[in-house]
């Protein structure tokens, strides 16, 4: 038995929960540390980079799920660890004005938990999707699950932004507690009972060690080339993650709630960008994965250039440009995810989890690297330049990286041909 559309939707709810919790740490808490607490942007940048760096263990989670099974347990366990880490991170933000050293130690511990939680839950979930979804449904399954994740991010950011104003430590802790507890409960209900009904491959007599499994996947030319592309493009994608909200607060005067809402609107743009590609490919038969990846990269570059220009125009409206950035980010992301899901099922069988783990690690390392470099560069240049110029230089570098990623995509995705998202037929 393979996954049906209802089961795919249920697993997508887990992605929704992951996005809802993670956005608290990369958006709300990041903004509070930089603007309200006046801490250097490199501090939350380093913490977020730590949680991404720990996800280098994703290949190990993937290989374990390939050889041992019981992915459901690790999906739920990972979500519980992620939720605990996010709540402790919020507690640390509240403690910073009172006990800086203790708050920093608690923050480090919290983001370690976040990193392990996302790695365990996310990799096990994606491996379950890739291995139990029919090939003709994989790209559509990717679209559904990532749309739900972005929906969770956008709704959480918008809702939290609404209830966070006026800001108070007590209000922050209540909001984070509700979101994290709700995520654990919904994840458990969503994933429970799905895996036991699926067809299970016969386990290997001598399961490979991690390095052996990685060597097998790395020997596949397509998997290797896609890993390099994913690292470069995700570095571009995440370079602004930790500085866009501080930029809105410092240059445009946005409040804490307004910047959190801005993040929600950006992710709303991502949602509609993903939806556009899904409808264009599956319904209207317009374009290919390669074409949409390139479109997303180039459109993101143009939106970033607009954000740079607006910083030097008094009274300029930032929101439309940020929504545009989200829209083209969504176009890029869903096309790249479709290619990734398709490639996960190619090559040697019973290595879907290892491939997803390898690409998840590449994405996580790129996200941590991009976020930390972006925050550090902005901090450094703000010492010598006006805020608008300092942030603008980072956004400009991100725009250039997206152009390079578009050029690379023409080779990497073209090597697979013009793969299309399968049509979702009513009643399936």
Swiss-Prot record:
One of its GO terms (cellular component) is membrane. Gene3D superfamilies: MFS general substrate transporter like domains. Keywords: Bacteriochlorophyll biosynthesis, Chlorophyll biosynthesis, Membrane, Photosynthesis, Transmembrane, Transmembrane helix. One of its GO terms (biological process) is photosynthesis. This is Bacteriochlorophyll synthase 44.5 kDa chain. InterPro entries: MFS_dom (IPR020846), MFS_trans_sf (IPR036259), PucC (IPR026036), PucC-rel (IPR004896). The chain crosses the membrane at residues 3-23, 32-52, 73-93, 115-135, 144-164, 172-192, 225-245, 269-289, 291-311, 317-337, 358-378, 393-413. It comes from Rhodobacter capsulatus (strain ATCC BAA-309 / NBRC 16581 / SB1003). PROSITE patterns: MFS (PS50850).
